[in-house]
């Protein structure tokens, strides 16, 4: 009986997370950016690759259709990777949609975050504005990819970072350019284990600012499995300020390897990450991400779009 009890408890723990919401149609994605159009509520899903893939649907569950690319000719930023853009992040301000993207190559710190704008989110409607001025070189303590925008009052900030010294933030002059003289400051750092953090996404709820980020090995699962727990997963910290002071549920600083687990591998879901938060028209907060569905395949080309409505307890989110 004791052995059966242990097995039951193990299985219960392994299935502590809700499965992703339903998805039909073109459900592939990688480092997704999701937005709901203001005019009609239609959903647009953007993904890493080429000039940033665009899919759309009338419902989160789909069916999702492939609509083309944001920048089919690539970015005007003259760096390796200008035709293979990463990590779209979107917001809407004063009648315009802004999309941040990253230009880089795997393992390189020669990186830049660019921005494009549209009034409709549709393919063919986007204007590339090139670099925001948020750039890095091998001499930088950070890597300027995975940009994420947030506004606090009349100030705008861009969160960014991947590996190296992890996650940083810098103030923007507007939605297009970094503020003159602004210096990036560190938001989060993991000194433990394999150390990797990236894909910052910050949002506000009930007087708290929440910093979500992805940790662990992001890809290559078709070649080799990382050690258990070292695959991609999603963590969260919170603060009463958008510019720092983030701690996890145990009060451990995000600058000192803190971070409470929000979503990890479970069931057929492996390596969830590249996440963001969507506030839909019903004011519900939805966590979205990519994951490897072990029933389909482990390669990047097999990644799937995942989403879950967040649950809340004591102002901490769960899935």
From Swiss-Prot:
Catalyzed chemical reaction(s): Endohydrolysis of (1->5)-alpha-arabinofuranosidic linkages in (1->5)-arabinans
Primary subcellular site in the record, as a coarse category: secreted
InterPro entries for the chain: GH43_arabinanases (IPR050727), Glyco_hydro_43 (IPR006710), Glyco_hydro_43_endo_a_Ara-ase (IPR016840), Glyco_hydro_beta-prop_sf (IPR023296)
EC class name: hydrolase
GO cellular component, one term: extracellular region
Site (Important for catalytic activity, responsible for pKa modulation of the active site Glu and correct orientation of both the proton donor and substrate): 146
Glycosylation sites: 190, 222
Metabolic or biological pathway: Glycan metabolism; L-arabinan degradation
Signal peptide boundaries: 1-16
EC numbers, comma separated: 3.2.1.99
Keywords in alphabetical order: Carbohydrate metabolism, Glycoprotein, Glycosidase, Hydrolase, Polysaccharide degradation, Secreted, Signal, Xylan degradation
GO molecular function: arabinan endo-1,5-alpha-L-arabinosidase activity
Locations listed in the record: Secreted
Active site (catalytic residues): 31 (proton acceptor), 198 (proton donor)
UniProt-listed Pfam families: Glyco_hydro_43
SUPFAM superfamilies membership: Arabinanase/levansucrase/invertase
Family, as annotated: Belongs to the glycosyl hydrolase 43 family.
Annotated PANTHER family: ARABINAN ENDO-1,5-ALPHA-L-ARABINOSIDASE, ARABINAN ENDO-1,5-ALPHA-L-ARABINOSIDASE C
Role description: Endo-1,5-alpha-L-arabinanase involved in degradation of pectin. Its preferred substrate is linear 1,5-alpha-L-arabinan.
Protein name in the entry: Probable arabinan endo-1,5-alpha-L-arabinosidase C
Species this protein is from: Aspergillus clavatus (strain ATCC 1007 / CBS 513.65 / DSM 816 / NCTC 3887 / NRRL 1 / QM 1276 / 107)
Gene transcribed to yield this protein: abnC
